[in-house]
Amino acid sequence: MRPSTSRASAIALTALLVSFGSVAAQDTTERPWSHLGPVRIRDLTPFGILRMDFLPAHAVTATPGTWALELTVSYQNTYVMSDNVADYLRAKGGGHRVRYDESDVAAILALPGEAYIVDGEIAVVDLTAHYRFTRHWGAYLTVPALFYDGGFLDSTIEGFHNLVGVGQENRELAERNQFFVVNKTKSGTLVFDGPPDGGLADPVFGARYSVVAEPKRWNLILEAAVKPAFRDAKPFVSSGRTDYGVQVSGQWFFRRQALYLSGSAVEYGGVDIEGVDHQTQLVPSVTFAWEFGLGRTVNGIIQLYSSPSVIKDTDLDELKATKYLTSLGIQGLVKTWVWRLALTENLLTFENTADIAATLSVAKVFPPKSR
């Protein structure tokens, strides 16, 4: 656990909460309120990004024949490494930042025991088409794309750490804005000394059943989905295996607030890539969210997410640790447009998750034509 990072996260989240409260205080006039549901974020961690992970169920009510197109863009920065890699970089740099090269790959692979480093930024783009067949049944198709780069956020993150007076958690050991991955565990070896080619990832087909067609106080939503492997395995793009699973979501609505709880179970087919765990496993996940009105058309959202690591074949406890993420955001409904903006931070466990992620989502609803 990295207590200084936890402190930085707490400061950032507290600042956002204060901002939300200030906005809410400016608009106390009673008016109709629209509940939208949780932020549509899936697992963004570099060690689980290829598996199918359910997006938490939205709470937008639609009539039969309604279409919707939803574009979600998430961008995350990851900088994690094992203790022996940190010791190596510290010794090599001698107080200066290291520019990764092939000699570092060889040196890390030669370290005794298991070792890993993941330094880079990942963009996840999800395009989802929704359709409502009946008052209760709907379906969706999500087509994701993944992109990798050395990025641009390292300086911003380090500056924020300095601003709030916390440590850099080994960020001072390497030059900024590089992409570098070396993973040496019992599963094998995976090496990238530059950003890999991104591209279209495996699509997800899902069906959704809403128990209450037009919910006023509560709703229960059941979903089933499959992620077929439509291509051969490709590192950081496709697992080459098929995943499938189910999700159950409870939704409770109040005057200007709503609570959401989603639980899912996914049969993860593993990854057909050398250096990554191959084993099939059942991966549960839980999302809890609180939505509250802030203004005329804007809501705030606080969201918590947890799921176990898919990495099992290692002696490094930090890679096997359960992941905990928190998201804070704002979202709104403007005519037939739904927009969401959120920041996601890691909690409790830090060595197998992204340091920070930002998500922007825009959806356009196409109601059925009146006859």
Residue ranges and their predicted role:
Residues 73, 131, 143, 209-211, ...:
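Residue-level signature of outer-membrane beta-barrel architecture
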Residues 144-281, 317, 333:
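Outer-membrane pore/translocation modules
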Residues 23-104, 368-371:
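Outer-membrane beta-barrel biogenesis signature
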Residues 65-67, 72, 77-80, 237-312:
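Detector for outer-membrane/organellar transmembrane beta-barrel domains
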Residues 64, 134-136, 146, 212-215, ...:
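Outer-membrane beta-barrel channels and translocator barrels
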Residues 89-92, 162-189, 276-371:
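Outer membrane beta-barrel transmembrane domains
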Residues 67-71, 139-141, 205, 218-224, ...:
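Transmembrane beta-strands of outer-membrane beta-barrel proteins
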Residues 72-76, 144-146, 210, 225-229, ...:
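Outer-membrane beta-barrel pore domains and translocons
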